């Protein structure tokens, strides 16, 4: 079944807020691209624990967040965010939103064609969709270092991809096929300092990868530390794909 990484993804919302706070902190450029207006109704695809959702609300919009992690939805609701536990590809909204937004989510959605069509349906005619995701080349050094460490320890890294790190052309093809026009997608090189260290990043952001490689919980901190030694820096080689598009009026 070609779906989001899992029908519901498991994240530790507290760990994510601690180790991954940079995700929302660096989401300002995508939010500015969305340019939410007072009175608009906006769909936040992959709202996480709701940090950026609240920033949209602060600009006067009404927002519905969706996410496929029960832990993240609980955290978002605790902040007062209107949020639903729902994979992006399963949304059944029809012309309800003036705009849609997504930050650091779409690269997790392997059912990309279905998700693109669902977002398109959710927008009113003339509605816009803006955001950011991991792009082509994202985290190549870190991902390679992790797989090398797994192999040395006798584990088999998963063969199937857990992320869609698209080129601008690949991304545009999917969303134009969904019906969008004026698709503007571009890669942004964004080396990112990981304040809590690469080891914590590995155990938080590559949890699903470690699950699939069947690495025991008791060994994961050790794996993370070894990957940090391999990389030799707390700067992660992030590449973002930033985009904006419109549904025809």
Predicted features along the sequence, with ranges:
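Class I SAM-dependent methyltransferase SAM/SAH-binding core
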Residues: 43-45, 49-91
């Amino acid at each position: 079944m070609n779906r989001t990484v899992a029908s519901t993804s498991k994240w530790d919302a507290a760990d994510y807020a601690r180790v991954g706070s940079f995700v929302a902190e660096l989401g300002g450029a995508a939010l500015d691209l969305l340019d939410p207006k007072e009175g608009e109704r906006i769909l936040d695809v992959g709202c996480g624990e709701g940090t950026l959702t609240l920033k949209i609300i602060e600009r006067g919009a009404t927002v519905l967040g969706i996410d496929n992690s029960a832990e993240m939805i609980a955290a978002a609701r605790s902040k007062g965010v209107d949020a639903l536990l729902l994979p992006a590809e399963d949304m059944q909204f029809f012309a309800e939103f003036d705009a849609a937004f997504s930050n650091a989510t779409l690269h997790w959605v392997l059912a990309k064609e279905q998700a693109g069509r669902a977002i398109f349906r959710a927008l009113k005619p003339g509605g816009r969709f803006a955001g950011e995701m991991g792009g082509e080349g994202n985290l190549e050094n870190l991902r390679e270092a992790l797989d090398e460490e797994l192999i040395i320890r006798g584990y088999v890294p998963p063969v199937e991809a857990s992320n869609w790190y698209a080129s601008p052309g690949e991304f545009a093809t999917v969303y134009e096929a969904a019906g969008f026009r004026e698709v503007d997608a571009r890669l942004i090189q964004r080396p990112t300092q990981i304040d809590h260290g690469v080891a914590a990043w590995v155990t938080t952001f590559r949890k699903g990868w470690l699950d699939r490689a069947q690495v025991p919980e008791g060994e994961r901190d050790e794996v993370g530390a070894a990957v940090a030694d391999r990389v030799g820096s707390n700067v992660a080689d992030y590449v973002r794909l930033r985009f904006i598009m419109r549904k025809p009026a």
